[in-house]
A protein has these predicted regions:
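Short glycine-rich phosphate-binding loop at a beta-alpha junction
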Residues: 39-45, 153, 161-164
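Short basic (Lys/Arg) and small-residue
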Residues: 167
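Active-site-proximal alpha-helix that buttresses catalytic centers in soluble enzyme cores
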Residues: 1-71
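Conserved histidine-centered catalytic loops in small-molecule metabolism enzymes
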Residues: 39-69, 87-101, 106-109, 201-238
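Acidic, low-complexity terminal tails and accessory targeting/binding regions
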Residues: 73-89, 149-161, 172-238
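Phosphate-handling substructures
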Residues: 61-144
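Surface-exposed helix-capping loop/turn segments at secondary-structure junctions
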Residues: 36-39, 141-157
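Short active-site segment of divalent metal-dependent hydrolases/proteases
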Residues: 11, 170-171
Length: 238
């Protein structure tokens, strides 16, 4: 199975929607996916994710199935911290060096919650439980049951191409869990762009277990092909 995780296009957060640029980015995505196709399309319940998925849905004549657990609003409640001036924002927006200092760089999956850089998460002990449950149920429905950190039992070998249109917050929180990487170390080094396409291969190994491998990360080549601005977060020319 190939799992495509796509961030929504250039957003308007209030009211929840896409900018004109975001709609053009979504149309560029549809042309990208028209080349090799998809078998299933899933999306967050939020409008900006569904609007990003809509052109691809129309081109491929596939319905958009909603995954409630992939809502960024839910993740926001679990993974935001206070910055100076009581400004609330994502924990992964800290200066990235903080995740690799004071011994935090030595912590792994078993003890990452001891990292000094994550202590301000309001319910640190339980912050991942909802996302873990949603991820595990989603992947098990697709034929891959989580057995341990980054290891999945192959219940039903699949060659399907599956897309989930979601969010920066959801992607940066979910991917380290799915891959079995300490989240604070992942946050220190990775980010995703508007309509960035990340691809994960679930190889159907003969011994019945698999570990998802990232074979492409936050790819935006579709923007170049359509002559759209090729920037990170509308700020950095790429």
């Amino acid at each position: 199975m190939l799992l495509f995780v796509i961030r929504h296009g250039d957003p308007i957060y209030d009211p929840d929607s896409l900018t004109p640029r975001g709609h053009l980015q979504a149309k560029a995505l549809a042309k990208r996916f028209a080349v090799h196709g998809l078998d299933r399309i899933y999306a967050s319940p939020l409008i900006r994710a569904q609007q990003t998925a809509q052109p691809t849905s129309e081109v491929l004549n596939l319905p958009i199935q909603i995954e409630e657990w992939a809502s960024e609003n839910l993740a926001w409640e679990e993974f935001t911290v206070k910055y100076s001036g009581d400004f609330l924002h994502w924990v992964f927006f800290r200066q990235n060096t903080e995740f690799r200092q004071n011994g935090d760089e030595l912590l792994g999956n078993g003890n990452w919650k001891d990292a000094k850089s994550v202590q301000e998460i309001k319910d640190l002990e339980n912050c991942y439980k909802r996302l873990e449950k949603g991820s595990d149920a989603f992947l098990e429905r697709l034929g891959y049951k989580r057995e341990s950190c980054g290891i999945y039992r192959i219940l039903k070998p699949s060659e399907e191409r599956v897309a989930l249109f979601c969010h920066q917050g959801v992607t940066l929180l979910w991917i380290p869990y799915m891959l079995g990487i300490p989240p604070h170390l992942f946050w220190s080094s990775f980010d995703v762009n508007h309509t960035g396409v990340s691809v994960f291969e679930f190889k159907n190994n003969p011994n019945g277990i698999t570990s998802p491998k990232c074979i492409s990360f936050s790819d935006n080549s579709h923007l170049l092909l359509e002559g759209l601005p090729y920037q990170f977060q509308n700020e950095i020319d790429l």
